[in-house]
């Protein structure tokens, strides 16, 4: 069976970490943003050795605090040409929000489940982004 990846970076990461299990199902709970909106989430991989779900990113996270904030911004951007560029999706997508990732991490932690964001090469993170992730307590690594 051929494994389908969401991005080339996920495929490359998996080739370098073949012991990881590709995750196609939703994480084992639901999550709630600051507006009370319930959402589901997926991780990219599961590490059976460390019992950790792993989300791979190759861009720094955006700062949209709620799913609706993200959708509102995407709606405005979409009005210009009828679609979002890949960069606009990363800069405004809820899936790429530092707050979404933090909600997922904190909720899973309450269930005794570890969740790690891996910023995989050639990710460039600003000092401001690193400071913010550290201040919020986001569990991440840069590889």
Question: Which residues are covered by each model-predicted region?
Answer:
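Nucleic-acid endo/exonuclease domains
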Residues: 1-143
């Amino acid at each position: 069976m051929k494994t389908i990846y969401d991005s080339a970076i996920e495929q490359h990461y998996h080739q370098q970490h073949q012991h990881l299990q590709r995750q196609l199902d939703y994480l084992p709970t639901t999550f709630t943003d600051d507006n009370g909106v319930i959402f589901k989430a997926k991780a990219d991989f599961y590490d059976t050795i460390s019992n950790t779900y792993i989300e791979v990113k190759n861009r720094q996270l955006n700062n949209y605090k709620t799913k609706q904030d993200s959708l509102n911004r995407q709606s405005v951007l979409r009005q210009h040409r009828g679609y979002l560029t890949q960069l606009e999706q990363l800069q405004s997508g809820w899936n790429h929000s530092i707050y979404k990732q933090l909600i997922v991490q904190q909720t899973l932690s309450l269930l005794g489940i570890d969740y790690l964001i891996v910023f995989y090469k050639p990710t460039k993170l600003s000092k401001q982004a690193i400071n913010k992730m550290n201040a919020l307590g986001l569990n991440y690594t840069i590889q």
